[in-house]
């Protein structure tokens, strides 16, 4: 609600309708609190908001299968405008930038690199870039991937690397690893 009121107080609605703005605020609040949510999962809420605005009964909003599949095509643009308005830095550095230097440093296998790339892609489902530096994310993912594939001979190198070369990420390394392990565990449970 704070996002919605803050935005509507300082901005006009120009091309954004209230349903899209409301849903975007709900999505952002959910992402901040819990992590990634698929846009398809918002269809029912979007149609419910549309039906309330048109004066329809809220009980019929989920009954029509055709309308339940309709979502706002503009939702991502509204989210970007809202984040931009709030001053959020939309130029986010990606963990991929550090992958080649980690590959040179630890000389891990192609299998490990593929797992690392998949885990970096999956990490976008959690707001890791908001909480951790991309270098920390890349290093934590490398650690988890090497641990998952039992490349024990390299694990001590990572600890030494953190201790000697990257002292400044030491405090955020273990919390990032914990989140990634939970992500990997939940993904393995789904498969």
Where do the language-model regions lie?
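Structured all-alpha helical bundle cores of eukaryotic regulatory proteins
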Residues: 1-177
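C-terminal regulatory segments
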Residues: 176-191
